[in-house]
From Swiss-Prot:
This is Viral cathepsin. Glycans are attached at residues 103, 135. One of its GO terms (molecular function) is cysteine-type peptidase activity. It is an enzyme of class 3 (hydrolase). Synthesized as an inactive proenzyme and activated by proteolytic removal of the inhibitory propeptide. Cysteine protease that plays an essential role in host liquefaction to facilitate horizontal transmission of the virus. May participate in the degradation of foreign protein expressed by the baculovirus system.
Length: 367
């Protein structure tokens, strides 16, 4: 019996050791590659030695060209940074254990690490870099309501990504402005234009910040209301004609420069992920809402563990796939190419990851 217990303990210790064998402290440099490693290759898990926090912090300040004039602010940001290192370690450990419990390959596990948000508290990031404002959901909308549920009516492929047919515009960065609602609305329109006209076009988010009379600019909004407002404005200008400023300005809409006009829009009550696949496949990328709490530190891989209770961020669902038998969604974010998988995120499918079934989706119909 003693030998049996000894073997069990040996197996437990071996497994725990395996989890922390993937120690890559020198990857604090981050983003040194213009693209993530092959998604099918084993992904090392970062573990930050908290005793080295000050070294990591100085490296972080240098890499992201940050400084603080006030010594108290420096100390505060350093303490926040240390808290985030601890959070990152926990996220890496929890996702590995979740993969183990699901009998999933360790290579698919999400990897978290230091990024440009690492000197900010989660609340600061959610306040300044998201912008899905659910309180506006009771506002009247011109968009048609549709329920997304039931079995798909067509056979769907195991993998589909609108990027493969050049129907998704490059990643953008909303900056320190709660304008995700504008970016996802414009991203949807850009993809709809590419699907209809086989051409990518860069459209203006700033027009929505300045001229939308229902949404709240950098204080948040909703994507279907953005579609409605663009319908009433007569369309949207290009980014070149109405460039992004990252803050609300006076409306300077010029109807002579309208580049894309909308015919209508839809607000979707999403209740089934398989039916959602069909919607993305037949309609194009769909704007959805998620809880961004657990994606702040995301670097790559398929996210298993994800907070689902407070929808606060709008993103664009552009496809799906399966890696090592793990089904996932592909999401386009608006936090720049230096976040995540070159600006994109993958989350596990069929588990309501990040609360993507908790509210609604939206899409536009263009001329």
């Amino acid at each position: 019996m003693r030998k049996y217990h000894s073997n069990i303990m040996h197996k437990i210790i071996t497994f725990v050791s395996l989890l922390w064998t993937f120690v890559v402290c020198d990857e604090i440099s981050l983003h040194t590659s213009s693209s993530p490693p092959p998604l099918s290759s084993p992904v090392p898990v970062l573990y930050y030695n908290l005793d080295q926090s000050e070294i990591y912090f100085k490296h972080f300040l240098q890499q992201y060209n940050k400084s603080y004039d006030d010594p108290k602010e420096y100390q505060y940001r350093y303490n926040v940074f240390k808290d985030n290192l601890n959070k990152i370690n926990s996220q890496n450990r929890e996702n590995l254990l979740n993969n183990k419990n699901n009998n999933d390959s360790l290579s698919t596990s999400a990897q978290f690490g230091v990024n440009k948000f690492s000197d900010k508290t989660p609340d600061e990031v959610l306040h300044s870099n998201t912008g899905f404002f659910l309180n506006l959901s009771q506002h009247y909308t011109l968009c048609e309501n549709r329920i997304v549920k039931g079995a798909p009516d067509i056979r769907l492929p195991d993998y589909y990504d609108w990027r493969d047919t050049n129907k998704v515009t490059p990643i953008k960065d909303q900056g320190v402005c709660g304008s995700c609602w504008a970016f996802v609305a414009i991203g949807n329109i850009e993809s709809q234009y590419a699907i209809r006209h086989n051409k990518l076009i860069d459209l203006s988010e700033q027009q929505l910040l300045d001229c939308d009379e229902v949404d709240l600019g950098c204080n948040g909004g909703l994507m279907h209301l953005a579609f409605q407002e663009l319908l009433l404005m007569g369309g949207v200008e290009t980014e070149a004609d109405y460039p992004y400023q990252g803050s609300e300005q006076m409306c300077t809409l010029d109807n002579r420069k309208i580049a894309v006009k909308l015919n209508s829009c839809f607000k979707y009550d999403i209740r089934d992920e398989n039916k959602l696949k069909e919607l993305v496949y037949t309609t194009g990328p769909v704007a959805i809402a998620v809880d961004a709490m657990d994606i702040i530190n995301y670097r790559r891989g398929i996210l298993n563990q994800c907070h689902i209770y407070d929808l606060n961020h709008a993103v664009l669902l552009i496809g799906w796939g399966i890696e090592n038998n793990v089904p996932y969604w592909i999401i386009k974010n608006s936090w720049g190419e230096d976040w995540g998988e070159n600006g994109f995120l993958r989350v596990r499918r069929n588990v309501n990851a990040c609360g993507l079934l908790n509210e609604f989706g939206a899409s536009s119909v263009i001329q």
